[in-house]
Protein backbone atom coordinates (compact mmCIF):
# COMPACT_ATOMS: atom_id res chain seq x y z
CA UNK A 1 0.00 0.00 0.00
CA UNK A 2 1.19 3.51 -0.78
CA UNK A 3 -0.06 5.90 1.88
CA UNK A 4 -0.63 9.57 1.16
CA UNK A 5 2.67 10.73 2.59
CA UNK A 6 4.55 8.24 0.45
CA UNK A 7 2.37 9.08 -2.55
CA UNK A 8 3.06 12.81 -2.24
CA UNK A 9 6.75 12.12 -1.99
CA UNK A 10 6.40 9.83 -5.02
CA UNK A 11 4.31 12.41 -6.82
CA UNK A 12 6.90 15.10 -6.63
CA UNK A 13 7.30 16.49 -3.12
CA UNK A 14 10.68 14.94 -3.65
CA UNK A 15 9.87 14.01 -7.15
CA UNK A 16 9.36 10.60 -8.73
CA UNK A 17 6.76 9.49 -11.23
CA UNK A 18 3.44 7.82 -10.68
CA UNK A 19 3.14 6.83 -14.30
CA UNK A 20 5.74 5.52 -16.70
CA UNK A 21 8.11 8.13 -18.04
CA UNK A 22 7.00 9.75 -21.27
CA UNK A 23 9.39 9.74 -24.23
CA UNK A 24 11.99 12.47 -23.95
CA UNK A 25 11.52 15.35 -26.36
CA UNK A 26 14.78 15.62 -28.29
CA UNK A 27 14.09 19.05 -29.69
CA UNK A 28 12.18 22.18 -28.89
CA UNK A 29 8.68 21.46 -30.17
CA UNK A 30 7.42 24.97 -29.49
CA UNK A 31 10.05 27.22 -31.06
CA UNK A 32 10.13 30.86 -30.03
CA UNK A 33 11.24 33.63 -32.40
CA UNK A 34 14.97 33.07 -33.00
CA UNK A 35 15.91 36.67 -33.72
CA UNK A 36 15.37 39.74 -31.55
CA UNK A 37 12.39 41.82 -32.56
CA UNK A 38 11.35 45.36 -31.81
CA UNK A 39 7.73 45.31 -30.73
CA UNK A 40 5.69 48.48 -30.98
CA UNK A 41 2.08 49.31 -30.33
CA UNK A 42 -0.43 51.19 -28.21
CA UNK A 43 -2.50 50.50 -25.15
CA UNK A 44 -5.92 52.08 -25.59
CA UNK A 45 -8.82 52.67 -23.24
CA UNK A 46 -12.10 53.46 -24.97
CA UNK A 47 -10.05 54.48 -28.00
CA UNK A 48 -7.65 56.80 -26.14
CA UNK A 49 -4.05 56.09 -25.23
CA UNK A 50 -3.33 55.06 -21.63
CA UNK A 51 -0.06 56.30 -20.14
CA UNK A 52 2.29 54.43 -17.79
CA UNK A 53 1.09 50.92 -18.57
CA UNK A 54 3.80 48.28 -18.12
CA UNK A 55 4.49 46.22 -21.25
CA UNK A 56 6.80 43.20 -21.21
CA UNK A 57 8.09 40.22 -23.14
CA UNK A 58 8.88 38.38 -19.90
CA UNK A 59 12.48 39.62 -19.99
CA UNK A 60 12.37 43.41 -20.01
CA UNK A 61 9.68 45.89 -19.00
CA UNK A 62 8.82 49.26 -20.54
CA UNK A 63 5.96 51.69 -19.93
CA UNK A 64 3.68 53.47 -22.37
CA UNK A 65 4.08 57.18 -23.03
CA UNK A 66 1.37 59.82 -22.66
CA UNK A 67 -0.23 58.62 -25.91
CA UNK A 68 -0.26 54.99 -24.85
CA UNK A 69 2.56 54.09 -27.23
CA UNK A 70 5.45 51.77 -26.43
CA UNK A 71 8.53 50.30 -28.07
CA UNK A 72 9.95 47.09 -26.62
CA UNK A 73 13.20 45.43 -27.74
CA UNK A 74 12.09 41.81 -27.29
CA UNK A 75 14.47 39.02 -26.36
CA UNK A 76 15.13 36.32 -28.95
CA UNK A 77 13.54 33.70 -26.67
CA UNK A 78 10.42 35.76 -25.95
CA UNK A 79 7.12 34.09 -26.87
CA UNK A 80 4.57 36.73 -25.81
CA UNK A 81 4.16 40.44 -25.48
CA UNK A 82 1.81 41.33 -22.65
CA UNK A 83 0.65 44.15 -20.46
CA UNK A 84 0.19 44.57 -16.75
CA UNK A 85 -3.51 45.43 -16.93
CA UNK A 86 -3.99 48.89 -15.39
CA UNK A 87 -6.41 49.60 -12.57
CA UNK A 88 -9.74 51.10 -13.53
CA UNK A 89 -10.28 48.95 -16.63
CA UNK A 90 -12.32 45.81 -17.25
CA UNK A 91 -10.42 42.54 -17.61
CA UNK A 92 -10.79 41.25 -21.18
CA UNK A 93 -11.51 37.53 -21.14
CA UNK A 94 -12.52 34.70 -23.41
CA UNK A 95 -14.58 31.89 -21.83
CA UNK A 96 -13.30 33.07 -18.47
CA UNK A 97 -9.60 33.12 -19.42
CA UNK A 98 -8.08 36.58 -18.95
CA UNK A 99 -6.73 38.05 -22.21
CA UNK A 100 -3.76 40.38 -21.64
CA UNK A 101 -1.17 38.92 -24.03
CA UNK A 102 -0.39 38.32 -27.70
CA UNK A 103 1.94 35.67 -29.17
CA UNK A 104 4.97 37.20 -30.88
CA UNK A 105 5.04 36.47 -34.61
CA UNK A 106 7.93 38.68 -35.64
CA UNK A 107 8.56 39.37 -39.32
CA UNK A 108 11.65 41.18 -40.57
CA UNK A 109 12.63 42.01 -37.01
CA UNK A 110 9.41 43.86 -36.18
CA UNK A 111 6.01 43.20 -34.67
CA UNK A 112 3.05 45.37 -33.75
CA UNK A 113 0.71 44.59 -30.86
CA UNK A 114 -2.08 46.89 -29.71
CA UNK A 115 -4.16 46.29 -26.58
CA UNK A 116 -7.68 47.66 -26.37
CA UNK A 117 -9.36 48.05 -22.98
CA UNK A 118 -12.68 49.36 -21.69
CA UNK A 119 -12.94 51.78 -18.78
CA UNK A 120 -14.90 50.43 -15.82
CA UNK A 121 -18.10 52.18 -14.86
CA UNK A 122 -17.46 51.49 -11.16
CA UNK A 123 -14.61 52.16 -8.75
CA UNK A 124 -12.42 49.05 -8.58
CA UNK A 125 -10.77 50.00 -5.30
CA UNK A 126 -13.47 47.74 -3.87
CA UNK A 127 -13.41 44.30 -5.43
CA UNK A 128 -13.32 40.61 -4.62
CA UNK A 129 -11.24 37.71 -5.82
CA UNK A 130 -11.38 33.97 -5.25
CA UNK A 131 -8.63 31.36 -5.27
CA UNK A 132 -9.42 27.99 -6.79
CA UNK A 133 -6.54 25.68 -5.87
CA UNK A 134 -6.08 22.23 -7.37
CA UNK A 135 -9.21 21.61 -9.39
CA UNK A 136 -7.07 18.67 -10.61
CA UNK A 137 -9.49 16.80 -12.84
CA UNK A 138 -8.25 13.49 -14.27
CA UNK A 139 -11.43 12.23 -15.96
CA UNK A 140 -14.57 13.47 -17.65
CA UNK A 141 -16.44 12.47 -14.49
CA UNK A 142 -14.23 14.80 -12.43
CA UNK A 143 -14.84 17.53 -14.99
CA UNK A 144 -18.58 17.04 -14.73
CA UNK A 145 -18.36 17.34 -10.93
CA UNK A 146 -16.41 20.55 -11.30
CA UNK A 147 -19.12 21.94 -13.56
CA UNK A 148 -22.06 20.57 -11.57
CA UNK A 149 -20.87 21.46 -8.05
CA UNK A 150 -17.96 23.88 -7.84
CA UNK A 151 -18.76 26.30 -10.66
CA UNK A 152 -22.44 26.78 -9.68
CA UNK A 153 -21.38 27.29 -6.05
CA UNK A 154 -19.05 30.09 -7.09
CA UNK A 155 -21.65 31.57 -9.43
CA UNK A 156 -24.16 31.61 -6.56
CA UNK A 157 -21.62 33.24 -4.27
CA UNK A 158 -21.11 36.06 -6.77
CA UNK A 159 -24.89 36.49 -7.02
CA UNK A 160 -25.07 36.91 -3.23
CA UNK A 161 -23.04 40.14 -3.46
CA UNK A 162 -24.54 43.48 -4.54
CA UNK A 163 -25.19 43.73 -8.26
CA UNK A 164 -22.18 45.03 -10.15
CA UNK A 165 -19.62 43.79 -7.61
CA UNK A 166 -16.26 43.18 -9.24
CA UNK A 167 -14.81 39.68 -9.04
CA UNK A 168 -11.87 37.90 -10.57
CA UNK A 169 -10.58 34.38 -10.05
CA UNK A 170 -7.14 32.88 -9.59
CA UNK A 171 -6.65 29.30 -10.76
CA UNK A 172 -3.77 28.37 -8.47
CA UNK A 173 -2.30 25.48 -10.44
CA UNK A 174 -2.99 21.81 -11.10
CA UNK A 175 -5.96 22.87 -13.18
CA UNK A 176 -5.98 19.32 -14.57
CA UNK A 177 -4.18 16.12 -13.60
CA UNK A 178 -1.86 15.54 -16.58
CA UNK A 179 -4.79 15.09 -19.00
CA UNK A 180 -4.66 18.22 -21.15
CA UNK A 181 -7.83 17.37 -23.07
CA UNK A 182 -9.66 18.28 -19.84
CA UNK A 183 -8.62 21.92 -20.10
CA UNK A 184 -11.82 22.27 -22.13
CA UNK A 185 -13.83 21.20 -19.08
CA UNK A 186 -11.86 23.54 -16.82
CA UNK A 187 -12.49 26.44 -19.20
CA UNK A 188 -16.17 25.59 -19.38
CA UNK A 189 -16.33 25.60 -15.57
CA UNK A 190 -14.66 28.98 -15.11
CA UNK A 191 -16.77 30.35 -17.95
CA UNK A 192 -19.87 29.41 -15.95
CA UNK A 193 -18.80 31.61 -13.03
CA UNK A 194 -19.09 34.84 -14.99
CA UNK A 195 -15.70 36.18 -13.90
CA UNK A 196 -12.27 36.38 -15.54
CA UNK A 197 -9.68 33.92 -14.26
CA UNK A 198 -5.93 34.43 -14.12
CA UNK A 199 -4.20 31.05 -14.12
CA UNK A 200 -1.04 29.66 -12.54
CA UNK A 201 0.83 26.60 -13.77
CA UNK A 202 1.05 23.58 -11.46
CA UNK A 203 3.11 20.39 -11.56
CA UNK A 204 0.20 18.51 -13.16
CA UNK A 205 0.00 21.13 -15.91
CA UNK A 206 3.50 20.33 -17.19
CA UNK A 207 4.44 18.69 -20.49
CA UNK A 208 6.18 15.56 -19.24
CA UNK A 209 7.89 14.84 -22.57
CA UNK A 210 9.91 18.06 -22.39
CA UNK A 211 13.67 17.67 -22.16
CA UNK A 212 14.04 20.60 -19.76
CA UNK A 213 12.07 23.13 -17.77
CA UNK A 214 12.29 25.65 -20.62
CA UNK A 215 9.80 23.65 -22.71
CA UNK A 216 7.69 22.08 -19.98
CA UNK A 217 4.93 24.70 -20.17
CA UNK A 218 4.23 24.68 -23.90
CA UNK A 219 0.68 23.29 -23.60
CA UNK A 220 -0.19 25.57 -20.70
CA UNK A 221 1.05 28.57 -22.70
CA UNK A 222 -1.07 27.56 -25.68
CA UNK A 223 -4.12 27.48 -23.42
CA UNK A 224 -3.51 30.36 -21.00
CA UNK A 225 -0.56 32.47 -22.16
CA UNK A 226 2.57 33.35 -20.18
CA UNK A 227 3.39 31.58 -16.93
CA UNK A 228 4.47 34.73 -15.08
CA UNK A 229 2.87 38.15 -15.35
CA UNK A 230 1.17 40.88 -13.35
CA UNK A 231 -1.95 43.04 -13.34
CA UNK A 232 -3.52 45.79 -11.26
CA UNK A 233 -6.95 46.18 -9.77
CA UNK A 234 -7.82 49.14 -7.58
CA UNK A 235 -4.88 49.78 -5.28
CA UNK A 236 -3.61 46.19 -5.38
CA UNK A 237 -0.83 44.85 -7.59
CA UNK A 238 -1.20 41.16 -8.51
CA UNK A 239 1.68 38.93 -9.61
CA UNK A 240 1.53 35.37 -10.97
CA UNK A 241 4.66 33.21 -10.87
CA UNK A 242 5.77 29.78 -12.08
CA UNK A 243 7.56 28.03 -9.21
CA UNK A 244 7.41 24.47 -10.59
CA UNK A 245 10.88 23.72 -11.98
CA UNK A 246 10.81 20.56 -14.10
CA UNK A 247 14.11 18.65 -14.07
CA UNK A 248 13.57 16.78 -17.31
CA UNK A 249 12.45 13.30 -16.37
CA UNK A 250 9.05 11.77 -15.63
CA UNK A 251 7.29 13.88 -12.96
CA UNK A 252 10.36 15.14 -11.15
CA UNK A 253 10.35 18.80 -10.18
CA UNK A 254 11.40 21.16 -7.41
CA UNK A 255 9.90 24.33 -5.99
CA UNK A 256 12.12 27.02 -7.47
CA UNK A 257 11.91 30.48 -9.05
CA UNK A 258 14.19 30.92 -12.06
CA UNK A 259 16.52 33.87 -12.44
CA UNK A 260 14.57 35.01 -15.53
CA UNK A 261 11.46 35.38 -13.39
CA UNK A 262 13.24 37.08 -10.51
CA UNK A 263 14.91 39.53 -12.91
CA UNK A 264 11.54 40.28 -14.51
CA UNK A 265 9.90 40.64 -11.09
CA UNK A 266 12.54 43.16 -9.99
CA UNK A 267 11.64 45.32 -12.97
CA UNK A 268 7.91 44.84 -12.43
CA UNK A 269 8.05 45.81 -8.75
CA UNK A 270 10.14 48.92 -9.47
CA UNK A 271 6.95 50.36 -10.95
CA UNK A 272 4.99 49.70 -7.73
CA UNK A 273 4.96 52.23 -4.90
CA UNK A 274 6.45 50.93 -1.61
CA UNK A 275 3.71 50.16 0.90
CA UNK A 276 1.35 48.92 -1.82
CA UNK A 277 -0.54 45.69 -1.21
CA UNK A 278 0.96 43.05 -3.51
CA UNK A 279 -0.70 39.66 -4.02
CA UNK A 280 1.62 36.96 -5.40
CA UNK A 281 0.12 33.70 -6.65
CA UNK A 282 2.12 30.52 -7.31
CA UNK A 283 1.40 26.81 -7.05
CA UNK A 284 3.98 25.31 -4.70
CA UNK A 285 3.93 27.08 -1.30
CA UNK A 286 6.95 29.07 -0.25
CA UNK A 287 6.71 27.34 3.14
CA UNK A 288 4.53 24.81 4.95
CA UNK A 289 4.31 23.02 8.29
CA UNK A 290 4.63 19.62 6.61
CA UNK A 291 8.18 18.87 7.79
CA UNK A 292 7.37 19.66 11.43
CA UNK A 293 4.01 17.88 11.50
CA UNK A 294 5.37 14.71 9.91
CA UNK A 295 8.67 14.75 11.85
CA UNK A 296 10.79 14.81 8.70
CA UNK A 297 14.52 15.45 8.84
CA UNK A 298 14.46 17.94 6.00
CA UNK A 299 12.04 19.67 3.66
CA UNK A 300 11.15 17.85 0.47
CA UNK A 301 12.35 19.75 -2.58
CA UNK A 302 9.04 19.62 -4.40
CA UNK A 303 7.02 20.70 -1.36
CA UNK A 304 8.14 24.31 -0.95
CA UNK A 305 10.11 26.98 -2.81
CA UNK A 306 13.84 26.51 -2.27
CA UNK A 307 14.81 30.13 -2.95
CA UNK A 308 11.89 31.73 -1.10
CA UNK A 309 14.18 34.06 0.86
CA UNK A 310 15.05 35.89 -2.34
CA UNK A 311 11.34 36.37 -3.05
CA UNK A 312 10.68 37.58 0.50
CA UNK A 313 13.50 40.11 0.17
CA UNK A 314 11.93 41.54 -2.98
CA UNK A 315 8.56 41.78 -1.25
CA UNK A 316 9.88 43.56 1.87
CA UNK A 317 8.83 47.07 0.77
CA UNK A 318 5.23 45.94 0.30
CA UNK A 319 2.26 44.60 2.22
CA UNK A 320 2.46 41.17 0.62
CA UNK A 321 0.14 38.18 0.48
CA UNK A 322 1.17 34.91 -1.18
CA UNK A 323 -1.49 32.56 -2.58
CA UNK A 324 -0.54 28.91 -3.06
CA UNK A 325 -1.96 25.39 -3.27
CA UNK A 326 -0.30 22.04 -4.13
CA UNK A 327 -0.38 20.41 -0.67
CA UNK A 328 -4.15 19.77 -0.56
CA UNK A 329 -4.32 21.22 2.98
CA UNK A 330 -5.28 24.64 4.35
CA UNK A 331 -2.85 26.71 6.43
CA UNK A 332 -1.57 30.26 7.00
CA UNK A 333 1.95 31.61 7.56
CA UNK A 334 3.33 35.05 8.39
CA UNK A 335 6.91 36.22 8.10
CA UNK A 336 7.62 39.93 8.39
CA UNK A 337 5.39 41.82 5.96
CA UNK A 338 4.51 38.63 4.06
CA UNK A 339 1.47 36.44 4.77
CA UNK A 340 1.03 33.18 2.90
CA UNK A 341 -2.32 31.51 2.34
CA UNK A 342 -1.91 27.81 1.49
CA UNK A 343 -5.30 26.74 0.16
CA UNK A 344 -7.42 23.68 0.57
CA UNK A 345 -8.60 22.24 -2.72
CA UNK A 346 -11.58 22.55 -4.98
CA UNK A 347 -11.28 18.79 -5.55
CA UNK A 348 -11.26 17.83 -1.84
CA UNK A 349 -9.25 14.60 -1.71
CA UNK A 350 -8.81 14.26 -5.48
CA UNK A 351 -12.60 14.05 -6.02
CA UNK A 352 -12.93 11.06 -3.68
CA UNK A 353 -14.73 12.77 -0.80
CA UNK A 354 -16.12 16.06 0.53
CA UNK A 355 -13.05 17.04 2.57
CA UNK A 356 -9.31 17.35 2.12
CA UNK A 357 -6.93 15.06 3.98
CA UNK A 358 -6.70 17.58 6.85
CA UNK A 359 -10.48 17.86 7.21
CA UNK A 360 -10.81 21.12 5.28
CA UNK A 361 -14.00 21.00 3.18
CA UNK A 362 -13.62 21.04 -0.59
CA UNK A 363 -13.95 24.67 -1.58
CA UNK A 364 -12.06 27.88 -2.15
CA UNK A 365 -11.01 31.13 -0.50
CA UNK A 366 -12.78 34.45 -0.97
CA UNK A 367 -10.90 37.75 -0.56
CA UNK A 368 -12.64 41.10 -0.15
CA UNK A 369 -10.53 44.12 -1.07
CA UNK A 370 -11.15 47.70 0.05
CA UNK A 371 -8.33 50.00 -1.00
CA UNK A 372 -5.17 48.29 0.22
CA UNK A 373 -6.93 46.26 2.91
CA UNK A 374 -7.89 42.61 2.41
CA UNK A 375 -10.31 40.47 4.41
CA UNK A 376 -10.89 36.79 3.70
CA UNK A 377 -12.89 33.69 4.48
CA UNK A 378 -13.10 30.09 3.30
CA UNK A 379 -16.13 29.05 1.27
CA UNK A 380 -16.99 25.35 1.52
CA UNK A 381 -18.64 23.98 -1.61
CA UNK A 382 -22.34 23.49 -1.01
CA UNK A 383 -22.25 25.12 2.42
CA UNK A 384 -23.16 28.63 3.61
CA UNK A 385 -20.46 31.22 4.24
CA UNK A 386 -20.98 30.74 7.99
CA UNK A 387 -19.70 27.15 7.85
CA UNK A 388 -16.22 27.69 9.32
CA UNK A 389 -15.75 24.87 11.86
CA UNK A 390 -16.72 21.27 12.54
CA UNK A 391 -17.37 19.96 16.07
CA UNK A 392 -16.69 16.33 17.02
CA UNK A 393 -18.17 14.45 19.97
CA UNK A 394 -16.04 13.00 22.75
CA UNK A 395 -14.15 9.92 21.65
CA UNK A 396 -14.38 10.62 17.91
CA UNK A 397 -10.61 11.19 17.95
CA UNK A 398 -9.42 7.77 19.08
CA UNK A 399 -6.14 9.06 20.49
CA UNK A 400 -7.99 11.53 22.77
CA UNK A 401 -11.04 9.54 23.86
CA UNK A 402 -11.99 11.82 26.78
CA UNK A 403 -11.94 14.98 24.68
CA UNK A 404 -14.18 16.72 22.19
CA UNK A 405 -12.46 18.21 19.16
CA UNK A 406 -13.12 21.01 16.70
CA UNK A 407 -11.56 21.59 13.29
CA UNK A 408 -11.26 25.30 12.41
CA UNK A 409 -9.74 25.02 8.95
CA UNK A 410 -9.13 28.70 8.19
CA UNK A 411 -7.60 29.35 11.60
CA UNK A 412 -4.55 31.53 12.11
CA UNK A 413 -3.01 32.78 15.39
CA UNK A 414 -5.19 35.90 15.40
CA UNK A 415 -8.38 33.85 15.76
CA UNK A 416 -10.00 33.46 19.19
CA UNK A 417 -11.61 30.14 20.18
CA UNK A 418 -13.74 29.36 23.24
CA UNK A 419 -16.03 26.57 24.33
CA UNK A 420 -19.27 27.00 26.26
CA UNK A 421 -21.21 24.52 28.36
CA UNK A 422 -24.93 25.25 28.67
CA UNK A 423 -24.27 28.87 27.66
CA UNK A 424 -21.36 29.46 30.07
CA UNK A 425 -17.85 30.10 28.72
CA UNK A 426 -15.51 27.42 30.09
CA UNK A 427 -12.22 28.09 28.36
CA UNK A 428 -10.08 27.95 25.24
CA UNK A 429 -9.69 24.66 23.36
CA UNK A 430 -6.11 23.38 23.20
CA UNK A 431 -4.37 23.28 19.84
CA UNK A 432 -2.79 19.92 19.00
CA UNK A 433 -1.22 18.42 15.91
CA UNK A 434 -3.52 15.53 15.05
CA UNK A 435 -5.63 13.84 12.39
CA UNK A 436 -9.13 15.01 11.61
CA UNK A 437 -11.35 12.07 12.66
CA UNK A 438 -13.69 12.30 9.66
CA UNK A 439 -10.68 12.25 7.34
CA UNK A 440 -9.50 9.12 9.17
CA UNK A 441 -12.88 7.47 8.65
CA UNK A 442 -12.97 8.39 4.96
CA UNK A 443 -9.38 7.84 3.91
CA UNK A 444 -7.38 5.68 6.36
CA UNK A 445 -6.51 2.10 5.53
CA UNK A 446 -5.40 0.14 2.47
CA UNK A 447 -8.85 -0.06 0.87
CA UNK A 448 -9.97 3.56 1.30
CA UNK A 449 -10.97 5.54 -0.57
CA UNK A 450 -11.94 3.19 -3.38
CA UNK A 451 -11.32 5.70 -6.17
CA UNK A 452 -7.73 6.65 -5.20
CA UNK A 453 -6.32 4.36 -2.53
CA UNK A 454 -3.18 6.47 -2.09
CA UNK A 455 -5.19 9.11 -0.19
CA UNK A 456 -4.50 9.11 3.54
CA UNK A 457 -5.43 11.53 6.33
CA UNK A 458 -2.68 14.03 7.14
CA UNK A 459 -1.67 15.80 10.33
CA UNK A 460 -3.08 19.29 10.80
CA UNK A 461 -2.43 22.29 13.04
CA UNK A 462 -6.05 23.48 12.99
CA UNK A 463 -7.56 20.85 15.31
CA UNK A 464 -8.41 21.88 18.89
CA UNK A 465 -9.39 19.82 21.95
CA UNK A 466 -11.28 20.31 25.22
CA UNK A 467 -12.69 18.05 27.93
CA UNK A 468 -16.37 18.73 28.69
CA UNK A 469 -17.82 18.45 32.18
CA UNK A 470 -19.79 15.31 32.98
CA UNK A 471 -22.86 17.43 33.71
CA UNK A 472 -22.79 19.43 30.45
CA UNK A 473 -25.88 19.03 28.28
CA UNK A 474 -25.13 21.44 25.43
CA UNK A 475 -21.69 22.29 24.06
CA UNK A 476 -20.96 25.28 21.84
CA UNK A 477 -17.66 26.22 20.26
CA UNK A 478 -17.39 29.86 19.25
CA UNK A 479 -14.69 31.02 16.85
CA UNK A 480 -13.88 34.68 16.18
CA UNK A 481 -11.69 35.38 13.17
CA UNK A 482 -9.09 38.14 12.92
CA UNK A 483 -11.69 40.50 11.44
CA UNK A 484 -14.25 40.04 14.22
CA UNK A 485 -16.46 37.58 12.35
CA UNK A 486 -18.05 35.13 14.78
CA UNK A 487 -18.94 31.53 13.92
CA UNK A 488 -20.22 28.76 16.14
CA UNK A 489 -21.35 25.17 16.21
CA UNK A 490 -23.44 23.54 18.92
CA UNK A 491 -23.87 19.91 19.93
CA UNK A 492 -26.42 18.51 22.37
CA UNK A 493 -24.98 15.72 24.51
CA UNK A 494 -26.95 12.58 25.31
Tell what function each PLM region has.
Residues 6-28:
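N-terminal export signals
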Residues 24-38:
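Beta-strand-rich domain onsets/edges
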Residues 34-38, 45-46, 90-184, 471-476:
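N-terminal active-site segment of His-dependent metallophosphoesterases
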Residues 36-40, 44-59, 76-78:
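Short, ordered, surface-exposed loop/turn motifs in non-cytosolic proteins
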Residues 59-73:
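Short, acidic Ser/Thr/Gly-rich low-complexity loop/linker segments typical of extracellular
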Residues 87-95, 100-107, 180-274, 295-323, ...:
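Extended active-site neighborhood of metal-dependent phosphoesterases/phosphodiesterases
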Residues 338-422, 456-490:
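Binuclear metal-dependent phosphoesterase catalytic core
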Residues 436-465:
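Aromatic sugar-binding surface patches on proteins
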Amino acid sequence: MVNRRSFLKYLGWSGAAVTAAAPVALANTNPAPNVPATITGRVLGNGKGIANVAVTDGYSVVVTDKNGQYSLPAAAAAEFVYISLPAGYAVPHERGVAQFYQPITAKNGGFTADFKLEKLAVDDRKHQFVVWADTQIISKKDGEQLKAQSAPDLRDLVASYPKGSLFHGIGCGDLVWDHFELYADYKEAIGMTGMPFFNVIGNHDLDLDARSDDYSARTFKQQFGPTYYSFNRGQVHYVMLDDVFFIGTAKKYIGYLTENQLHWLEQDLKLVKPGTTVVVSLHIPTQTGHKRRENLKEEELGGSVSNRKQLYEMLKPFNAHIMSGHTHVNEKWEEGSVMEHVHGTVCGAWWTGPICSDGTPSGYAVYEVDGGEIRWYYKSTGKPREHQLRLYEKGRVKTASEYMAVNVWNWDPKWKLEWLEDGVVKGTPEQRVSHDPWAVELYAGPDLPKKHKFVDPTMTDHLFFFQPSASAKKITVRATDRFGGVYSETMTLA
